[in-house]
Structures are given as C-alpha cells and as structure tokens.
Amino acid sequence: MPPSGLRLLPLLLPLPWLLVLTPGRPAAGLSTCKTIDMELVKRKRIEAIRGQILSKLRLASPPSQGEVPPGPLPEAVLALYNSTRDRVAGESADPEPEPEADYYAKEVTRVLMVDRNNAIYDKTKDITHSIYMFFNTSDIREAVPEPPLLSRAELRLQRFKSTVEQHVELYQKYSNNSWRYLGNRLLTPTDTPEWLSFDVTGVVRQWLNQGDGIQGFRFSAHCSCDSKDNVLHVEINGISPKRRGDLGTIHDMNRPFLLLMATPLERAQHLHSSRHRRALDTNYCFSSTEKNCCVRQLYIDFRKDLGWKWIHEPKGYHANFCLGPCPYIWSLDTQYSKVLALYNQHNPGASASPCCVPQALEPLPIVYYVGRKPKVEQLSNMIVRSCKCS
C-alpha cells in the first residue's frame, strides 16, 4: 500500500489543478474570456502596420507629403511596379479547390457592365482602336461576398456577324490609366452573332480583395509595328451604336457581362466548419460569428486610415489579421497539454493555450516618393494569407 501522504495528494491540490489533471475534460471550460472589441483590434492592427511600413523603409517619420509631385507616375516606374506586383501575384497562385467544395453546385450570377450612358465612358467614346467595359465592384460583391467563394469568373461579350478577320487583345484596368495585358484571340469571319468568353477569375478575385469602386477591361485591336490599321473592326452587342425599338432593348440586355460561379455563403460556412476539423489554420472567416482561429479581412486605405499621401501605389491593400480561439483539448493526441500546464505554473506570463498567429505571409510592392524621386520597394510579410494555432 502506498504511503498515506501519496493517497491524500489529490485532496491537497487546488481546484484548478484537479481540473487540469482530470483526463477527458477540456481546459476551455475554464475560459473567462471577455467579448472582443473588433474595432479596437482593427485600430491596433492599423497602428502596427503604420510602424511596420516606416520601420521596413528605415524611416523615422513619414516623408513630407507636400513634396509629392502631382500627375501620373513615369512610365518606367509604373512598368517596374506592375511587373513586381505581377510576380508576387504569380508566386501566390490560387490553391486547387478542395474536392468536397468542388462537389457541390455553384450559384451562377450575371453582372452587367455599367450602362453606356454613365459619365465614366465619356472619354472613351471617340476611341476607334478599343472598346471599354466597366463594372461596379459593389454589384460583384453582392453576388460573391468573399473572394474565396468565387469558383470561376468569365467575361462574356457578343460580337455581331463580321466579314473581317482581326487579332484582338484584352487588358485589365489599373490605376493611373495603365492597362495590364491579359490575353489575345484571333477572330475569324462569321455569318451569325457569336459569344466570346474570357477567363477573368484572377482579375475578379483581385477586385473583391480591393475596396468598392469602378473597374474595367479594354478590348483592343492588335497593333503591329508594320501596320497602320489600328481600328477595331469588331462590333460588340451593347456597345456598338444602338438599334431602334425592340432591337434596342435586346441590344442593351445583351451588353457585356461577367458570369460568376460561386459557392453560396451558407454552403461555404458548412464546408468551412467541416474543414476546421481537418485543418484549422488555412481558412478565411466567412462570417462575423466565426468561433475558431482564422484570417479576418482588413483593408487598409493609406489616405483614409493612415493619413498618408506619399505612397503613390497601391492606394491600399488587404493586410488582414489572425483572430479566434484555438482548441485546447485533453486527449490522447494532445498529451503535450500536460507539459503546457506545468510550464504555465512556472511561467505565469506565458500563454495558457495555443495562440492564433499568421502562418503564410505575402509581400507588398509599393511606389513612394523620396523628395520628388519615385522609388519602388517590396515590403516583406505584409499580407496575412493563412493562420495557425501555435
């Protein structure tokens, strides 16, 4: 028989130790966490980013904003920035969809381009080498609330019958009236109207990751160096001169549009919760009531949030942050919890459970001015892409 002192040991331990040393009982039952003030968390994240950017650029304070020259960036600087951003985007290619998420039906939505009577088209009406198609990102966001929900996006436009063969190109609108090349196509003569389709999934995801506004595409004639014919000979339904009467109504209804295929939010929440059982650290929060560790979206507008005008590009970015509790379960596969409990007894300032921290981070290219000289820099580890419990 063991000594009586050992038999009485459990009775001498304080109540918390009895709970910690009782197998099968989750430590989460002891939680006394208060409700999180999300606005306070966001403000602290914004202030942390302010210091982070200045520190990475080795600046004690923001450059004088009165020295920033007006007008667009020099073409060489803009080209360098665009190529840097494209390289970063290429390195962070979208992951393959999970089989379970890919199994379920996608909701299909059509988002029409902004009506041609909108003033945004005024500067483009007399241009003969291109046609322009603008979209309101708030309309896109109504159909797809979160970027991860988007499965596919296509730009659809209907061309009228044509007797001309022409090489055409598609561009994505960037700021400062610059355009990013997306692809090209050879259009052959046709006796009937024909629908053209372009995969723009990556572009629409970028728009969803930015603030609301007007974004667009340019559909242009290919300009070869040895050709003087730089006129687009393709007529597009909804953009070319309107027909009268009923034909005009049909013409307007068939104007270019985005065809969006996305997982409905309520279905995504179900898939998201099931994925948590397998991988807690690779998901965005699909609602404000998310209960576990995940990526919370946070868009930083340099002017509105930081009061900065000296960063010329981009105007802002999705910094994001990690938030949410991490499971602290007593089970056969988490016996290290015993060690953590003992560690905490001797280190009261240490965390009593795993913390929700960034796992994957991406860089942010920026263009800023030092005096009147523009500089292109890439700031490392600025965008939170996934979180983990650690």
Swiss-Prot record:
Family from the record: Belongs to the TGF-beta family.
UniProt xrefs under InterPro entries: Cystine-knot_cytokine, TGF-b_C, TGF-b_propeptide, TGF-beta, TGF-beta-rel, TGFb1, TGFb_CS
Pfam families: TGF_beta, TGFb_propeptide
Record keywords: Cleavage on pair of basic residues, Disulfide bond, Extracellular matrix, Glycoprotein, Growth factor, Mitogen, Secreted, Signal
Name this polypeptide is given: Transforming growth factor beta-1 proprotein
Site (Cleavage): 278-279
One GO cellular component term: blood microparticle
GO molecular function: cytokine activity; deubiquitinase activator activity; enzyme binding; growth factor activity; identical protein binding; protein serine/threonine kinase activator activity; protein-containing complex binding; transforming growth factor beta receptor binding
PTM per Swiss-Prot/TrEMBL: Transforming growth factor beta-1 proprotein: The precursor proprotein is cleaved in the Golgi apparatus by FURIN to form Transforming growth factor beta-1 (TGF-beta-1) and Latency-associated peptide (LAP) chains, which remain non-covalently linked, rendering TGF-beta-1 inactive.
Region called Arm domain, residue ranges: 75-271
Spans annotated as Bowtie tail: 226-252
UniProt GO BP: adaptive immune response based on somatic recombination of immune receptors built from immunoglobulin superfamily domains; animal organ regeneration; aortic valve morphogenesis; ATP biosynthetic process; branch elongation involved in mammary gland duct branching; bronchiole development; canonical Wnt signaling pathway; cell activation
Keyword Secreted on entry: yes
Domain of life of the native organism: Eukaryota
Keyword Secreted set for record: yes
Disulfide bond entries: 285-294, 293-356, 322-387, 326-389
Role played: Transforming growth factor beta-1 proprotein: Precursor of the Latency-associated peptide (LAP) and Transforming growth factor beta-1 (TGF-beta-1) chains, which constitute the regulatory and active subunit of TGF-beta-1, respectively.
Gene: Tgfb1
Quaternary structure note: Homodimer; disulfide-linked. Interacts with the serine proteases, HTRA1 and HTRA3: the interaction with either inhibits TGFB1-mediated signaling and the HTRA protease activity is required for this inhibition. May interact with THSD4; this interaction may lead to sequestration by FBN1 microfibril assembly and attenuation of TGFB signaling. Interacts with CD109, DPT and ASPN. Interacts with EFEMP2. Interacts with TSKU; the interaction contributes to regulation of the hair cycle. Interacts with TGFBR3.
Tissue expression summary: Abundant in the bone matrix. Expressed in cardiomyocytes.
Signal peptide bounds: 1-29
